[in-house]
Amino acid sequence: MPLLFKKIKDLRNFLKNKRCEGKEIGFVPTMGYLHEGHRQLIKLARMQNDIVVVSIFVNPTQFGEGEDYDRYPRDLERDLEICEEEGVDVVFAPEVDEIYPKGYRTKVCVGELGKVLEGEFRPGHFDGVATIVVKLFNIVQPNRAYFGEKDYQQLKIIEQVVEDLNIPVEIVPVPIVREEDGLAYSSRNVYLSPEERESALSIYKSFLLAEKMIKAGERDAKRIKEAIRAFIERHPHVKGVDYVEITDQNLNPKETVEKGDRILVAVRVGNARLIDNWKVQS
């Protein structure tokens, strides 16, 4: 079983000793309810580091009013079992008041990149993400940290924060992991009924449709985005498409689509809000 730490002080003491022994530390920050996508992050961390630390913390500051903080799935026992299966050395699962004690005041503001796409629909979300990630980097002080490309905007923002604040950690991006039918793994998939899940597959199918259009010579981003939106919206349990955007790899919007660009979507299906993205292959 991995060592479980709840207190910053105890974790720091343990890791300080490991660093003194010359051990390299890989870090996977999560909100728990681990799935196959997390396993891939952990596997890569395990291959590249002497010590693997996984944090499990549902961070309240990245949830807005009326979002799913209270109902976000939690199961520490199951998470610990998965961590054990994947050879994790340390799990850090603090309480909220350990991370944000009474009187906590400071936050990281990420600027323009945090106001578009997800940021438009979840104001302040990325400031909350950046704040907790910087805190965790300061607590763990890892050599490398692992982030999935499924949360592509989050990944780009963390890269920006690390660069801008001179944080000495290597950010390692890990490709999206999909279920057999193409649905991207997400802790929020648990909210979907079987029928809703069927409708959620329209996201992946819309990427294949876009890829087909691009392969056939369509390069107009507006037309491709319209086709994606129309395809997803005609599925029965889709309550709305928050956005469909096509950007370069640094999230600058594109008018003409090229290989390597990103298609990013956010879709509300039943009670779940799902985000996904696709790297243009053609």
Swiss-Prot record:
Tell me which residues bind (R)-pantoate.
Q62, Q154
Where does it localize? Cytoplasm
Q: What is its main location?
A: cytoplasm
Q: What keywords does the record list, in alphabetical order?
A: ATP-binding, Cytoplasm, Ligase, Nucleotide-binding, Pantothenate biosynthesis
Q: Which reaction does it catalyse?
A: (R)-pantoate + beta-alanine + ATP = (R)-pantothenate + AMP + diphosphate + H(+)
GO BP terms, alphabetized: pantothenate biosynthetic process
**Catalytic residues, chain numbering:** H38
Enzyme class comes to: ligase
Q: Which residues bind beta-alanine?
A: Q62
**Gene Ontology terms for molecular function:** ATP binding; pantoate-beta-alanine ligase activity
A Gene Ontology cellular component where this protein is annotated is: cytosol
The pathway where this protein functions is: Cofactor biosynthesis; (R)-pantothenate biosynthesis; (R)-pantothenate from (R)-pantoate and beta-alanine: step 1/1
Membrane-crossing residue ranges in chain numbering: none
What are its E.C. numbers?
Answer: 6.3.2.1
Q: Any extra remark in the record? A: The reaction proceeds by a bi uni uni bi ping pong mechanism.
| Entry similarity comment | Belongs to the pantothenate synthetase family.
Tell me how this protein assembles.
Homodimer.
What biological function has been recorded for the protein in this entry?
Answer: Catalyzes the condensation of pantoate with beta-alanine in an ATP-dependent reaction via a pantoyl-adenylate intermediate.
Name listed for the protein in its UniProt record: Pantothenate synthetase
The organism is: Aquifex aeolicus (strain VF5)
